[in-house]
Amino acid sequence: MSENLNILLAQTNPIVGNIDHNRDLVLDIVSKNKDADLIIFSELVLSGYPPEDLVLKSAFQNKVCDAFHEIMDASVESESYIIIGRPWKENEQLYNAAIVLHKGKVFHRHLKNTLPNYGVFDEKRIFAAGNESSLFEIKGNKIALFICEEIWDSETYKKVEGKDCDLVVTINASPFEYKKISQRENLAIELSKKINAPVIYVNQVGGQDEIVFDGSSFVADANKVLRRLPACESTSDLVTFNKTKKEFSFSEKVFDEKSEEEILYSNLVLGLKDYIEKNNFPGVVIGISGGIDSAFSACVAVDALGSDKVKGIMMPSKYTSNASVEDATLLGKNLNIEMISLSIEEAALAYESTLKNVFEGTEQDITEENIQSRIRGMLLMAYSNKFGYMVMTNGNKSEVSVGYSTLYGDMCGGFSVIKDLYKVDV
């Protein structure tokens, strides 16, 4: 028996609810990687993550089961062991599970012990918690299997301490946060020290509504990260583990290292791209004011979708400076996007005329300013309704956190790519 174990890290972009797509992702990777002894997919790759209330529907559960059995049938022709994340029903309870397939059979199953219930997570509402540690053996290699949150919980991973593991595998759907990648890596290094085995961390990649999964899968030992997969890319990597030496060897494939700022920008691009494409919008339309927020949003949109799928609309009034118009026009030219100019002057006068008797005897104030903002929102939404393009809003986190916006005005839209960036970050 060979001492080497060939392991494929499959960093994929599943779509929540599109089980056929997710099944095909898995089948395609399995069919193209026959040299792998072990293929590792991410948490709940079959359903997509987070599945939320979809996973409570029996029709959805049945569809997942059907897709799983298709993969199981296909695995008969493969020598690989395949780790798949999926919802799993057992004794009338629904679990977040990692299933190991081999030769058309369930070789091993692990039910997630630690269920996160904070921030974007609400797994305790949906899933029951498992309570067993998870160890299985492949070609003489004893492997400890974890699912995401479990490696952040010392009570869970203590269950396998002292059990002579050769390797730790954790499958994940861990959302991106600024500088979180280094937190995960440091956690894995500490876990490797405690269990005395190297760690393989496979994470989901892709946008799902307001969440972005950065991927950034890696291999680490007790001293350092040995191999990193790129952030924000669907990719895979074949690594070889030698049990006797407890060492890895890697292919000559080169992955570009990115700075923290580049990774942050890449996640903005990925989040917008997947939101538009997974929801089948033809493109986006943005109100371009000549300011930095709308300019940055437009840059992200072009990088995410291409200039042909981004429309810019300028909506000047009598208060709009020439400099703002010139800046907006230059932006459109530099990004090679179609720019449309719609004056709001006549619409503003119409509102002024309609409200003249009601407002008689009052001074102009923020009310009139907000009317202008709402006219712009109406024009953007009219374009969206007519042509199907989704309106992007341009509110940053500094503005949103203090309510600095106009209801039914600059808040109109379906997605703000900078909603989680403070003004200073923009």
Task: Report each predicted region and the residues it spans.
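Enzyme catalytic cores with a strong preference for nitrogen-chemistry domains
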Residues: M1-G287, V300-K309, M314, N334, ...
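Short, acidic/small-residue loops that bind anionic groups at enzyme active sites
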Residues: V64-F68, P316, F415-K423
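Active-site adenylate/phosphate-handling loop in enzymes that bind or generate adenylated species
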Residues: K112-P116, F121-N131, K139-G140, G162, ...
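A conserved beta-strand->alpha-helix junction
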Residues: E233-T240, K309-M314, N322-T367, S373
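Secondary-structure transition/capping motifs at alpha-helix termini
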Residues: Y275-P282, V302-K311, T320, L330-I340, ...
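A glycine-rich phosphate-binding loop feature that marks nucleotide/adenosyl-phosphate handling sites
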Residues: F281-S294, A347-A348, N396-S398
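Short glycine/threonine-rich loop-to-helix capping motif typified by GTGT followed
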Residues: G290-V302, L355, G409
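Short glycine/serine/threonine-rich phosphate/pyrophosphate-binding segments
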Residues: S294-S297, S321-N322, V400-S401
